[in-house]
């Protein structure tokens, strides 16, 4: 049987998501482990890239905003939307943060 080709969507990061990644890296680095900071950010970016092949792998988060989905990467939650041509990463927050704070920000 022929192998199915997986369609791959583009990937974009909203300014807030870029800022979130920078804050995560800075926080871990400031607490003494720049190698760990790099590994955590790389793992988050890998998970974001996975979404371009499996966009619906995340959990629908209609409780926060229409069309919003989320996946986890370690202790972090990646919030995103699926568009016709790309995955848009909107926020990347520590899992302990209050989701209610997202309402109105996405």
Protein language model features and the residues they cover:
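Enriched for short, Lys/Arg-rich terminal
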Residues: 76, 81-106
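Residues at alpha-helix boundaries and the short loops/turns that link adjacent helices
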Residues: 31-34, 51, 96
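Basic/aromatic recognition patch in beta-strand/loop cores that engages polyanionic ligands
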Residues: 46, 56-86
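Arg/Lys-rich, positively charged N-terminal/basic patches that mediate binding to nucleic acids
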Residues: 1-39
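Alpha-helical transmembrane segments and membrane-interface helix-loop junctions
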Residues: 13, 25-26, 38-40, 46, ...
């Amino acid at each position: 049987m022929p192998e199915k080709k997986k369609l791959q969507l583009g990937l974009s990061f909203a300014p807030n998501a870029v800022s979130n990644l920078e804050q995560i890296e800075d926080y871990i680095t400031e607490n003494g482990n720049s190698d760990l900071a790099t590994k955590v950010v790389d793992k988050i970016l890998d998970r974001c890239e996975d979404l371009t092949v499996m966009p619906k792998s995340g959990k629908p988060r209609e409780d926060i905003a229409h069309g919003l989905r989320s996946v986890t990467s370690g202790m972090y939650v990646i919030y995103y939307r699926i568009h016709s041509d790309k995955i848009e990463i909107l926020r990347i927050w520590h899992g302990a943060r209050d989701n209610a704070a997202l309402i109105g920000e996405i």
